[in-house]
Amino acid sequence: MPIPASPLHPPLPSLLLYLLLELAGVTHVFHVQQTEMSQTVSTGESIILSCSVPNTLPNGPVLWFKGTGPNRKLIYNFKQGNFPRVKEIGDTTKPGNTDFSTRIREISLADAGTYYCVKFIKGRAIKEYQSGRGTQVFVTEQNPRPPKNRPAGRAGSRAHHDAHTCLSALPERNSTNYFVQPCCCLRLLGLTGLLSK
């Protein structure tokens, strides 16, 4: 009686095909698919990194990394670990699953970089089989801070501070309270002529 295929026991034909391709040196038949080459996101938002991995290979984990080489940073492991800002999109426990996409929330400027979805194969040791082409993430600051250009000298600094305070306190133009401001603020901002109109 044949043994039914499962993620732990792939179908015999696909295992034989994999072994034949390995022996022949053909390793680029299988592709880890990352659909987006680049994405732009603002700080504080979330981003989805897409990854599709065919289920025709022998068992082995899929991991997400930021960067390449020996200094690459592990971003997500679908099997174990604590990754508070990262969550998987697909159900990787479901037999036949091919979706290894992830969502990263609360993006910061430090999250800019290139992210890789990487397939490993279990053997005597876990061996990296193939990586996706990578998704480059650009991060823009949502509310950039204004530059601190204060005028020189004590009086100038005080005037700049008062002007900033007055400007930030002024309501919208369509507000009925637009001109109800302390006289010093109006004088400082050169708006005293508005009172006579």
From Swiss-Prot:
Keywords: Disulfide bond, Glycoprotein, Immunoglobulin domain, Secreted, Signal. InterPro entries: Ig-like_CS_Receptor, Ig-like_dom, Ig-like_dom_sf, Ig-like_fold, Ig_sub, Ig_V-set. Residues 139-158 are annotated as: Disordered. The keyword Glycoprotein applies. SMART domains: IG (SM00409). GO terms for cellular component: extracellular region; plasma membrane. Pfam families: V-set. Disulfide bonds join 51-117. Glycans are attached at residue 174. Its main location: secreted. Residues 31-135 form the Ig-like V-type domain. Residues 1-29 form the signal peptide. It is found in: Secreted. This is Signal-regulatory protein delta. It comes from Homo sapiens. The gene is SIRPD.
